[in-house]
Amino acid sequence: MAEITHIKARQIFDSRGNPTVEAEVTTANGVVSRAAVPSGASTGVYEALELRDGGSDYLGKGVLKAVDNVNKIIGPALIGKDATEQTAIDIDFMFQQLDGTVNEWGWCKQKLGANAILAVSLAVCKAGASVKKIPLYKHIANLAGNPKLVLPVPAFNVINGGSHAGNKLAMQEFMILPVGASSFKEAMKMGVEVYHHLKAVIKKKYGQDATNVGDEGGFAPNIQENKEGLELLKTAIAKAGYVVIGMDVAASEFYEKDKDITNFKEENNDGSQKISADQLKDLYKSFVDEYPIVSIEDPFDQDDWEHYSKLTAEIGEKVQIVGDDLLVTNPKRVEKAIKEKACNALLLKVNQIGSVTESIEAVKMSKRAGWGVMAHRSGETEDTFIADLSVGLATGQIKTGAPCRSERLAKYNQLLRIEEELGSEAVYAGANFRTPVEPY
């Protein structure tokens, strides 16, 4: 009954209106398991290849080549394979036999495309859970060898800037984390209340237009100073109890190693506001001193290992320094970051690396190093895989946008269902969001 009998892919659309790949895996028990691939706006240069068509259709962003690779190469090759054998399907068949492309950071998926491979990997994972007749999150936990399921703390991205919004704010995300909640359900209540209170604060201060939302449902008021964004959050969370702040700077979007940094979104920029990497480091330290910040993601360029290590050494005890573009969910880059003490948390994005198996390995390495893990991707579909992934791997944190826009709420609603299903066994990460479980 676990045998794969049919695989089909198609082109669908993500939350930005860009084409993406969806795959369906049918097993001998007649069940069809479907999965769609997410994408990102600010992508790291070390991510596995996302195969796009080029040309004029969809401004070059079509994925019909990747779809063809599933329908004509991957699909036929996996007929008869056991859907519960996730590692064998990912590594032995799709990577080694079918794609075979490698660079200094491992399997790069340049022949078939990480989006083609990942669509099948995700759908196979869902099929494996179906065959075993267990929830997807439990199947993922079993694949990882994780004995304890944990509901993550949601990091609500409530103010958008950078590549996620049309305002002048350089830093990309300002988030709230309800670590003081006793359950995921209560965390949602806190997040929603802060979100609506923030909307009222922004509307009163900047006008109705300022409550327009960005890519992830967060507000995008036309503010230019990053500190102003933090002040807005400080005001909004004052009445909400134990809620703390996280930031995604996405510094690779406006900064290069050995060059000065400037606000890339400032019109008629004359260079007068450029600062050095050391000055930027000190700016983060001042933010941490002044605001209840517990997480800073991508504080420097993806190649600036030196300043990542400096910042982690100086404030890593009280703040998690999250590697996104730095790590791209790649086990080999995680290994390097552990050795160099460049950060102390992994941003888990399955599409950066292109398979369930490699994602699990990156998480296990991170946990063994004592790191935190946060699951995420911004260019989303209605697929809720990431919700089950965060519970099954006990990441402790999930970042999937504001409590706004249906592709965002689909994940949060799935987490509410999982918590309800677990009943008295449900555990919410809360204040232990950085280390919710022992390494597995």
From Swiss-Prot:
UniProt keyword annotations, A-Z: Cytoplasm, Glycolysis, Lyase, Magnesium, Metal-binding
GO cellular component: phosphopyruvate hydratase complex
Active site (record annotation): E216, K349
SMART domains (UniProt xref): Enolase_C, Enolase_N
Catalytic activity: (2R)-2-phosphoglycerate = phosphoenolpyruvate + H2O
Family: Belongs to the enolase family.
Organism of provenance: Alnus glutinosa (European alder)
Entry's EC annotation: 4.2.1.11
Name of encoding gene: PGH1
SUPFAM superfamilies from the UniProt entry: Enolase C-terminal domain-like, Enolase N-terminal domain-like
GO molecular function: magnesium ion binding; phosphopyruvate hydratase activity
PANTHER family on file: ENOLASE
Subunit structure: Homodimer.
Subcellular compartments: Cytoplasm
UniProt pathway annotation: Carbohydrate degradation; glycolysis; pyruvate from D-glyceraldehyde 3-phosphate: step 4/5
Enzyme class, spelled out: lyase
The name this protein goes by in its record: Enolase
